[in-house]
Amino acid sequence: STDHVVDELERSLKDALDVVTAALDAGGVVAGAGAIEIEIADQIRDEAAGIEGRKQLAVEAFADAVDVLPRTLAENTGMDPIDALVDLRAEHDAGTTAGLISEGQTGIIADPIEYGVLDPAAVKREAVESATEASTMIVRIDDVIASN
């Protein structure tokens, strides 16, 4: 009935507004579509260049792990993941915001902000913090095992 449709529409609108409010209260939004992950991975790789020995390899491996989301997005949109990552890095090196946008049956590299593909900053921050904690624990466990 019409009343049911209106009620459902009101609930959906309220849910959408709650999501927006939560995102803004928690520090806003960041570009989605893997754009922020590419930038984070690039920053990690830049830092890795100044680290010597095995630690550098561990830091680079962490950067590779951060690239998993854009790589998966590329695969899911039918793009070659290696070519997509190379192109994304080139765009970011040129100073543009670029992500993997699903357009119909294919994927394109474009500015996710222009396409309205945004992620809550708090969610991304929490994901990076959790991944960092997990990586640190793995390295510590590996050090303990290696010392025995």
Placement of each model-derived feature along the sequence:
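Extended, low-charge hydrophobic alpha-helical regions
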Residues: 2-148
